[in-house]
Amino acid sequence: EWEGSSAAAEPTVSEAVAAGCDVVAFSGDKLLGGPQAGILAGRGEVIGRLRKHPLLRALRPDKLTLATLLSTLELYRDGHDAQVPTRRMLTAEPAVLRARADKLQQLCAAAGVDAEVVGTQAAVGGGAMPLRTLPSFAVALPAGEATGRGDALARKLEAALRHGEPAVVARIEAGRVLCDVRALVDDSELPLLAQALRQALHSCAGVEAAAAPSGLE
């Protein structure tokens, strides 16, 4: 429950319970940032009945899931929730993201990659906030306006990034590939991403050269 955060967009669990809901179901992963699990909260009487249901044995989580969920909840309880990657990504301030995008662009330039920092909207996605967007910044390739062949080249670059090592999930907008820095855990991933962009561009350049006509009959 992130009061004052730009990520807040719907009633929180505590608000739903306070409003009189007998049971509220929510995910242990997604916005909470813990392991994949389902959590039921609400009136003690109802939760007690659910604990006695025959299906509980089949649906109860294993010890590893419980341990990791407990660790995540303890971070929130103790005020260390900034250590939860999902929380950090969703609550990052635009100024921090702009600085991160600038650093990535500089690393790209040093690696010979022509990129440009652009403002964008990051989609939260998932079942929790499928339509919610947050202001963000991204590095766009190629820099400047896309040419008439931009869409085809962007698709090749996006595919090369997905199949690279490490794999990078980018998106295409207006004929250019965008790498949204809100999706990064922290700045330590920037050098790795810049290198992945360089490798993907070189891979696409090789494909373009191989496909180009030689001029020989």
What are these regions (language model features)?
Residues R60-L107:
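C-terminal catalytic subdomain
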